[in-house]
Amino acid sequence: MNYLFKNGRYMNEEGKIVATDLLVQDGKIAKVAENITADNAEVIDVNGKLIAPGLVDVHVHLREPGGEHKETIETGTLAAAKGGFTTICAMPNTRPVPDCREHMEDLQNRIKEKAHVNVLPYGAITVRQAGSEMTDFETLKELGAFAFTDDGVGVQDASMMLAAMKRAAKLNMAVVAHCEENTLINKGCVHEGKFSEKHGLNGIPSVCESVHIARDILLAEAADCHYHVCHVSTKGSVRVIRDAKRAGIKVTAEVTPHHLVLCEDDIPSADPNFKMNPPLRGKEDHAALIEGLLDGTIDMIATDHAPHTAEEKAQGIERAPFGITGFETAFPLLYTNLVKKGIITLEQLIQFLTEKPADTFGLEAGRLKEGRAADITIIDLEQEEEIDPTTFLSKGKNTPFAGWKCQGWPVMTIVGGKIAWQKESALV
């Protein structure tokens, strides 16, 4: 099916929002211009809505295989499509881990059979993510590994991390890191700060993250490896990454929507839906994340979509697993709380969720360019809705944002020229 989207707006090559039509033919973007006419194409009048590149998320947890009670490739990718994401990168903390030919081939077959959006799987750095034996990077790359990470845990052995970076560098691949120094975790379930003290909870200190990043940056410099930092959350981490970039070290970084919108002061009670890793930090950390995003220290926004069951989250804040769902709330949360409040521009938000992650990892995505795959998201910037977890397509309903009123909701997502998801009656 060919589509002609009429009367939309998009961000052009100069970063300006302008009027446009967009023609999709044979799964590709055929033309982006005003007043397009075309035969043999279904005309969809988007009536002034934003035509954006499909959103790109380099940090997601789909749980399959092994955690299908939390999420599946099918439910997770449908939730991603509803959130406007057309390309997502799946973390390897599944059971089994994609750490060898057999497991990666099985995962790729599942993706091919079930995914509603483009899914790029990470390969594990170490076998079973146990930290003691390196995987066969060459084989995992051959089978389509996006990059290498043990996300969910930090690689504790510096010699292992250095060896992994050297091998990844030879393959022109990135090493992606969840940064925690295990000796500093303190059995914590929240940030070590005012909230932990008030509620008598063990806290995770900020330095637990930043000291690990500092170590890895020096290792990346020694290995001449592209090193990407997951979900930055502390002022110290931002400072270390900024210094590394100024020194010319190949480091990039991401931040989550929840760390940009919330800090520990916003946690109303010992509610497990506010439990994520890294935890919500203090006000100074939150301000540093915004500053880091604006000055280029932090390159992109990634959701860290981490679904869990209601039963798992009902165990109380100390026993419940870390993580919140992110796909279906990301854009409206960021648009409402950052763009509408004048903290960043709409153009910047689009870049942080599209071209910046795509360019960082060399993906042919994130831009509406003629000849590229038609991965497109239509967004109604005027539409206001209340976040209602019961409407989530993800199996995970675990969100701290239930009841929040937000503007800027995706209404249609196109992947490879096919409609992957559409809001009922939004475009008629």
From Swiss-Prot:
Binding residues for Zn(2+) 2: 151, 178, 231
Catalytic activity as recorded in UniProt: (S)-dihydroorotate + H2O = N-carbamoyl-L-aspartate + H(+)
Cofactor remark: Binds 2 Zn(2+) ions per subunit.
GO MF assignments: allantoinase activity; dihydroorotase activity; zinc ion binding
Name of this protein: Dihydroorotase
Source species: Bacillus cereus (strain ATCC 10987 / NRS 248)
Active site: 304
One GO term of the biological process aspect: 'de novo' UMP biosynthetic process
Membrane-spanning residues: none
NCBIfam families xref list: PRK09357.1-2, pyrC_multi
Root EC class: hydrolase
The keyword Iron belongs to this UniProt entry's keyword annotation: no
EC number: 3.5.2.3
Record's keyword terms, sorted: Hydrolase, Metal-binding, Pyrimidine biosynthesis, Zinc
InterPro entries noted in UniProt: Amidohydro-rel, DHOase, DHOase/Allantoinase_Hydrolase, Dihydroorotase_CS, Metal-dep_hydrolase_composite, Metal_Hydrolase
Summary of the function given for this chain in its UniProt record: Catalyzes the reversible cyclization of carbamoyl aspartate to dihydroorotate.
Residues at which Zn(2+) 1 binds: 59, 61, 151, 304
Required co-factors: Zn(2+)
Family note: Belongs to the metallo-dependent hydrolases superfamily. DHOase family. Class I DHOase subfamily.
CC terms in the record's Gene Ontology section: cytoplasm
Pathway named in the protein's UniProt entry: Pyrimidine metabolism; UMP biosynthesis via de novo pathway; (S)-dihydroorotate from bicarbonate: step 3/3
